[in-house]
């Protein structure tokens, strides 16, 4: 009897890599000419990124620097949820960026339906914020991986726990 193979579809953010990207971005901001004398800063607060700058233009520049550093560190930028820009103390502007982890119910249903419609001989189960896919053939599982990569999801999907 053939053994079933399986893997999990998850969406995670490596907080250590996010912290490293923030530190590298802060160093770049300290050395950039257009940020000299500015009150621009970024920090990690309760699992959220907080971006503070003098005005909207510098805030956008701050986001651009951060995004390039996150991409270089291999952190998925699809999992960043930008909140509304708000005024802060001292005439500065602040923007919170939520770090999304886990697959929400809508995306999980979308993945599940796509797998069922593909007619591959695999089973998929939604387990909280991840999806377990099992099947006898590794080729079918790889086809499911390719299918999930092609879907338009609100978060970045990763594949873990191969068995």
Swiss-Prot record:
InterPro entries: DUF520, UPF0234-like_C, UPF0234_N, YajQ-like_sf
A Pfam family: DUF520
Transmembrane portions of the chain: none
Stored Gene3D superfamilies: 3.30.70.860, YajQ-like, domain 2 (3.30.70.990)
Keyword terms: Nucleotide-binding
Entry's Gene Ontology cellular component terms: cytosol
GO MF annotation: an example: nucleotide binding
CDD domains: YajQ_like (cd11740)
PANTHER family linked to this entry: UPF0234 PROTEIN YAJQ (PTHR30476:SF0)
Similarity section: Belongs to the YajQ family.
NCBIfam families tied to this protein: PRK05412.1 (NF003819)
Purpose: Nucleotide-binding protein.
Protein name as it appears in the record: Nucleotide-binding protein EAT1b_2037
Protein source organism: Exiguobacterium sp. (strain ATCC BAA-1283 / AT1b)
């Amino acid at each position: 009897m053939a053994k079933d193979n399986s893997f999990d579809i998850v969406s995670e953010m490596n907080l250590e890599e996010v912290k490293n990207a923030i530190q590298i971005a802060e160093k770049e901001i300290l050395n950039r000419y257009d940020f000299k004398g500015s009150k621009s800063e970024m920090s990690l607060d309760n699992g959220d990124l907080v971006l503070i700058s003098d005005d909207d233009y510098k805030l956008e520049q701050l986001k651009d620097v951060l995004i390039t550093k996150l991409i270089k560190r291999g952190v998925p930028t699809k999992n960043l949820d930008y909140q509304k820009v708000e005024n802060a103390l001292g005439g500065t502007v602040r923007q919170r960026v939520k770090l999304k982890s886990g697959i929400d119910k809508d995306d999980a249903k979308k993945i599940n339906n796509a797998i069922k419609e593909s007619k591959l001989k695999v089973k998929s189960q939604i387990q909280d914020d991840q999806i377990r896919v099992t099947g006898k053939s590794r080729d079918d599982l790889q086809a499911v991986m390719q299918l999930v990569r092609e879907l338009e999801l609100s978060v970045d999907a990763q594949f873990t726990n191969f068995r």
